Amino acid sequence: MAGVWVFKDGIVRRVENPGSEESSSAGDGGGGGRRKVLVHVPSGEVVASYEVLERRLRELGWERYLTDPCLLQFHQRSTVHLISVPRDFSKFKLVHMYDIVVKTRNVFEVRDAAAPAVSPAT
């Protein structure tokens, strides 16, 4: 796992190709130029909107907080975890995707947008 850890705007994240970070598009977060997507593994569904994300998180017992006007926040009573994402889906970046992956083990994963869909194991 190669890369550089970058601290920017109060967030620590791993950048695979630090030289291309400034020229990368908003959705890939510096991941080598390929666009990434968040995938709900059990269904194979790509999270293309916050409606999809919220539905899948609710299925797992996450509840939405309605207090912050700039963020969508989700909390699970059985843990101390808090998922925070920008209210504007166009600002949903790779660092937010990996935050969700870490806090919902084996339920979501980040894939290349062009990668073929993998059918869920039965």
From Swiss-Prot:
Transmembrane segments: none annotated. Residues 16-36 are annotated as: Disordered. InterPro entries: FPF1 (IPR039274). One of its GO terms (biological process) is regulation of flower development. It comes from the Eukaryota. Belongs to the FPF1 family. This is Flowering-promoting factor 1-like protein 3. It comes from Oryza sativa subsp. japonica (Rice).
